UniProtKB/Swiss-Prot annotation:
Belongs to the IPP isomerase type 2 family. It is found in: Cytoplasm. Substrate binds at R9, K10, S97, Q98, R99, Q161. This is Isopentenyl-diphosphate delta-isomerase. It comes from Methanococcus maripaludis (strain DSM 14266 / JCM 13030 / NBRC 101832 / S2 / LL). It holds the Pfam family FMN_dh. Involved in the biosynthesis of isoprenoids. Catalyzes the 1,3-allylic rearrangement of the homoallylic substrate isopentenyl (IPP) to its allylic isomer, dimethylallyl diphosphate (DMAPP). GO terms for cellular component: cytoplasm. CDD domains: IDI-2_FMN (cd02811). FMN binds at A67, I68, T69, S97, N125, K197, T227, G276, I277, R278, A297, L298.
Amino acid sequence: MNNNSIEYRKLEHLIVCDHCDVEYKKGTLLEDVELIHSGISNCDLDDIDTSIEIFGKKLNAPLIVAAITGGHPKAKEVNKNIAIAVEELNLGMGVGSQRAAISKSYLEDTYSVVRDHTSSLIIGNLGAVNFVEDSWDEEIISKSVEMIDADAMAIHFNPLQEAIQPEGDVNFKGLNILKEIISNYNKIHGKIPFIAKQVGEGFSKKDAIFLKEIGFDAIDVGGSGGTSWAAVELYRIKDEEQKNFSNQYFNWGIPTAASILEVNSAFSGPIIATGGIRTGIDIAKSISIGANCCGTALPILKAALKSSEAVTTVLERMIKELKTTMFLTGCNNINELKSARYILKGDLKNWKDQI
């Protein structure tokens, strides 16, 4: 196998994320969101409803397993374990970039395995840069949707990762072609929700305006504070000078909470909060400041490398924390949580004042 192949790279990413310190050294700024405790609660904890509807699917909680992997036999096992847990809890999940299976059809089952184990919300995944670099069109989207019977399609934007990755594609000029491609897909193949997805560096207000004009239905902010792809690529790089270069961007990006505020100021569609979402409290805070749903990846990857039961345990813990936080803020359902009172402090307050 060529060590520079996409397939090998997918395996490297799994190994690095499981064994190395790849998380940002700075936080998500969710620590600057203070939910106001309700001393009387006026709720029955057992009756609190965490369910939402998004992309035509009802989920038992506003929680999606964010895009992680695909494209290697080991990835098939990970996706299978996640899908089993998602089906049990009626949540959603995304798959990793499907580029590997576009170029090598024998890798399709590392993605399609998810539909063997769940009928819940599945989100496909393609890279924005490939529509420029490789002249992808709506038929590539169609193939990717069919591969996993996707309910929605994420188009990920990862300029930092591509700039640092030894084999990266760095021509992000001309992304406005996505407007025609998305429109063509919807006309030819039937409408599907399109999600603009960041992968750890966040979207700004300016980005949100552009993405809205392109025709995206939802935005996954993918803010900083969780997994740093600069860190992931740092561990893959062999050249010392390139390592030092990559290390300069270890903490680059818009923190998740700030990106939620940035996007929410210019975009009215669903907002998914990813990037350092580790607890149910993080979910509650994200929703209170403007997100509709949240996603988490790294803790799930580590669990999925063990078993589906381990994935279920992590997700159940987060849902329990979310329900408890709603109970402590007097919120009976997610709509009430969206209106929960909070105080912004420190850097996040300063950030909001300058949007």
